[in-house]
């Protein structure tokens, strides 16, 4: 696993300008469900328009930023709960090296997990498992992390995330299993941190259970900042959403994470504010590799890349886009047209 990750040490770092530029010309793992028509939130056509830069601007949703914000926390908790170390969480795997040019995957990382065998089955060993296993084994896995803002967490992988996971497995030959990590985080004021169910109930409904862990996220300005820090965990829902919308814009802030179970704010310079978090659900679902998945789906990726190239090289990209939409077997839906009208020039 370590040798495989080192192969991509010089790849564009995730969320860097080079990474964004590269992904605009490729079908990434997170694009795949949309390209395959499996994403209920974004279609083939909207993804095509997005890649062709036909939007007025890149959309920046609070829910997406929420997921990005808590990805690091989920990795810290995974390492703690499973006694492991996540590596390769910043690499970009270009599928060209395996014969899939134009396709890529940016994994949330790789780690070793301990599997314990008992009662004729294997399970993932965590610090919460008080079980005496008949035998154990350590295996390398791909990590995929999601932290939904509102969506109810179920004990299964949502169908529209399966292509992203299988893409990562297909482009990682040494790995035969992935884990889908899904966590439910809630925001709280610093004074609410600890072994209790207190949260900001203006942002999310109250929780009846106790948290698995908690901690602090600190936001610092990249410029000199001398005002008193604000407890963002006490904001009302509308203001907190606005805060999330601007968090990753124009490199205004740096984000710092406490270790789990911390309750004291760190001593730092240029602190704009901070907020507490609590995690109430943290589930780890194993996903086995389907060896033929990418081979079977790659023709659709190639068609998408062909459509994208047609638009980008056309003297009239909008006309080329509209022609593609009208000639496909599944034309734009009413919902797509509404979204299209709002987002395109």
Swiss-Prot record:
InterPro entries: NF-kappa-B_Signaling_Reg, PDDEXK-like_dom_sf, Restrct_endonuc-II-like, YqaJ_viral_recombinase. Its main location: host cell. It is found in: Host cytoplasm. The keyword Lipoprotein does not apply. GO terms for biological process: symbiont-mediated suppression of host NF-kappaB cascade. It comes from the Viruses. Keywords: Host cytoplasm, Host-virus interaction, Inhibition of host NF-kappa-B by virus. It holds the Pfam family YqaJ. The keyword DNA-binding does not apply. Plays a role in the negative regulation of host NF-kappa-B signaling pathway. Mechanistically, recruits IKKA/CHUK and IKBKB to suppress their kinase activity towards NFKBIA. Belongs to the asfivirus D345L family. Interacts with IKKA/CHUK and IKBKB. This is Protein D345L. It comes from African swine fever virus (isolate Pig/Kenya/KEN-50/1950) (ASFV). The lineage of its organism: Viruses, Varidnaviria, Bamfordvirae, Nucleocytoviricota, Pokkesviricetes.
């Amino acid at each position: 696993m370590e040798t495989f990750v080192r192969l991509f040490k010089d790849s564009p770092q995730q969320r860097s300008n080079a990474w964004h530029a590269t992904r605009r010309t490729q079908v990434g793992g997170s694009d795949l469900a949309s390209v395959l028509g499996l994403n209920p939130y974004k279609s083939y056509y909207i993804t095509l328009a997005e890649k062709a830069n036909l939007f007025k601007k890149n959309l920046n949703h609070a829910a997406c930023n929420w997921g990005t914000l808590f990805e690091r926390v989920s990795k810290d908790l995974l390492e703690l709960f499973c006694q492991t170390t996540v590596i390769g969480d910043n690499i970009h795997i270009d599928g060209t090296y395996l014969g899939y040019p134009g396709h890529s995957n940016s994994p949330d990382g790789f780690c070793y997990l301990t599997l314990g065998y008992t009662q004729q089955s294997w399970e993932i060993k965590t610090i919460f498992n008080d079980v005496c296993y008949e035998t154990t084994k350590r295996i390398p896995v791909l990590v995929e992390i999601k932290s939904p803002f509102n969506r109810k967490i179920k004990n299964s992988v949502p169908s529209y995330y399966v292509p992203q996971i299988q893409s990562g497995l297909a482009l990682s030959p040494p790995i035969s299993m992935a884990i889908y990590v899904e966590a439910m985080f809630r925001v709280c004021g610093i004074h609410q941190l600890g072994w209790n169910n207190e949260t900001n109930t203006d942002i999310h409904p109250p929780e009846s259970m106790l948290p698995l862990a908690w901690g602090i996220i600190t936001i610092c300005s990249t410029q000199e900042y001398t005002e008193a820090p604000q407890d963002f965990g006490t904001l009302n829902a509308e203001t907190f959403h606005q805060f999330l919308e601007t968090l990753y814009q124009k490199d205004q802030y740096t984000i710092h994470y406490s270790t789990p179970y911390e309750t004291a704010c760190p001593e730092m310079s240029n602190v704009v504010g901070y907020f507490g978090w609590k995690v109430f659900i943290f589930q780890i679902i194993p996903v086995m590799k389907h060896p033929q998945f990418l081979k079977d789906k790659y023709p659709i990726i190639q068609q998408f890349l062909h459509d994208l190239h047609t638009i980008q090289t056309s003297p009239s990209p909008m006309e080329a886009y509209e022609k593609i939409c009208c000639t496909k077997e599944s034309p734009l839906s009413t919902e797509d047209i509404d979204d299209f009208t709002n987002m395109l020039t």
